[in-house]
């Protein structure tokens, strides 16, 4: 399978995904946004605490 065939198949796959996908309604979008931001905040806080602990322990 050549490069042109791969690109053609990839384009067809993307078309199929786009045709099946649907836009989320406003409430689902905001729920996803809130969950994403909470997880991002949690991971950032965890990384900060780990860095703080290592800087205190190692001087």
Curated annotation (Swiss-Prot):
Name its GO BP terms in alphabetical order: intracellular protein transmembrane transport; protein secretion; protein targeting
Does the record carry Iron as a key word? no
Name the NCBIfam families on file: PRK09400.1-1
Sample GO molecular function, one term? protein transmembrane transporter activity
Corresponding gene?
Answer: secE
Q: Where is the protein localized? A: Cell membrane
Keyword list (alphabetical) reads:
Cell membrane, Membrane, Protein transport, Translocation, Transmembrane, Transmembrane helix, Transport
The organism is Metallosphaera sedula (strain ATCC 51363 / DSM 5348 / JCM 9185 / NBRC 15509 / TH2)
Task: Report the superkingdom from the record.
Answer: Archaea
User: What name appears for this protein in its UniProt entry?
Assistant: Protein translocase subunit SecE
């Amino acid at each position: 399978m050549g490069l042109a065939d791969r690109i053609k198949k990839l384009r067809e796959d993307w078309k199929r995904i786009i045709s099946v996908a649907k836009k989320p309604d406003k409430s689902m979008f905001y729920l996803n946004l809130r969950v994403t931001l909470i997880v991002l905040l949690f991971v950032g806080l965890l990384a900060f605490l780990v860095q703080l602990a290592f800087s205190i322990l190692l001087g």
